[in-house]
Amino acid sequence: TAIKLSGKEIAVCGKHSYHGSTILSANASDQDINKFWNIQNPMSVHKFEDANDLISICKGLYDMSFVIIEPVVGAGGVYDWSDDIWTILKEYQSKGGIVILDETVTGFGKLGTMFGFEKINFNPDMIILGKGITNGYFPMGACLINERIEKSVKMFNHGFTYSGHPVGCAAALETLKEIDKLDLEHKQINGVTRQYGCMGAIDFETPRQSLTVIKKMRELGYILEDGSENVSTAVFCLPYIFKDHNEFEEAI
């Protein structure tokens, strides 16, 4: 869709990114999967690692089709982007550029908000969703577009044989109902972790949160130590010396 709307065939993606295994999505990723196919890349792809890379690419390319990026890189190692990246992309959008946010991994509460774009305060032109939309019970994906893109699309013909499968739609609807019913979006437990060897601690925002975690772990057979009066929001993880790998795996 982005290629069709822009009329250009140059894509930009982030370092270590992964966006899928179809021809276009694989080629718009920083992965070696496309090397297994003896198929000519249908578009030119440029990759950036940091803000300086992205600035250079945006200045040097006047015929970019789109930028595709994950709010937090998933399969490529789980790391976030600097705030400068999002500032640059906002400027790119202001000049008519299209930014696609791949929320296949980060969507539906993985970052503490319903979607990653809320966490990073960024409004993409297109959002890719999957996995969490059905809580993993059925294969399902979705592509959301903003009003600017919607006005440019006369007819959307990029369908697949099983697009809109009723079982997938039912699973997605029930998942969304449960998220709303349990108010999962607002049940956040934000903790700061510290670790030195096998010694670890998690600092929660309130003593109530830490005690809730300790109580639940004890129900599961694990004894965690809560903090003293000065650190009442902390949960300490101090495992004993393991006699073998199996005990270690069980504790994990």
Predicted regions and their residues:
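Conserved N-terminal phosphate-binding loop of PLP-dependent enzymes in the Aspartate aminotransferase
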Residues: 1-252
